[in-house]
């Protein structure tokens, strides 16, 4: 393989990577907690897009529970976004884990 072919392959891979990054930005995953009382929507770049809180879990006397549920929902969405990114990048990275 000559240098020109290597450059073409690198450019093609760069275009594919850009496409996957755009897809990740547009793909939404959901994390939930409290049986769906809290829902966090996050894109494939792990940017929170929205948080929905059911009025039933808003108790001024138990703010700590609400905070805990939010953490669980955010972490759930983050794990799903990470898994999504790994799955989408796998064809480009040859299955090397931990790159994205």
UniProtKB/Swiss-Prot annotation:
One of its GO terms (molecular function) is DNA binding. It holds the Pfam family YbaB_DNA_bd. It comes from the Bacteria. InterPro entries: YbaB-like_sf, YbaB/EbfC. GO terms for cellular component: bacterial nucleoid; cytosol. Keywords: Cytoplasm, DNA-binding. SUPFAM superfamilies: YbaB-like. Its main location: cytoplasm. It is found in: Cytoplasm, Nucleoid. The keyword Flavoprotein does not apply. Binds to DNA and alters its conformation. May be involved in regulation of gene expression, nucleoid organization and DNA protection. Belongs to the YbaB/EbfC family. Homodimer. This is Nucleoid-associated protein Caur_0522.
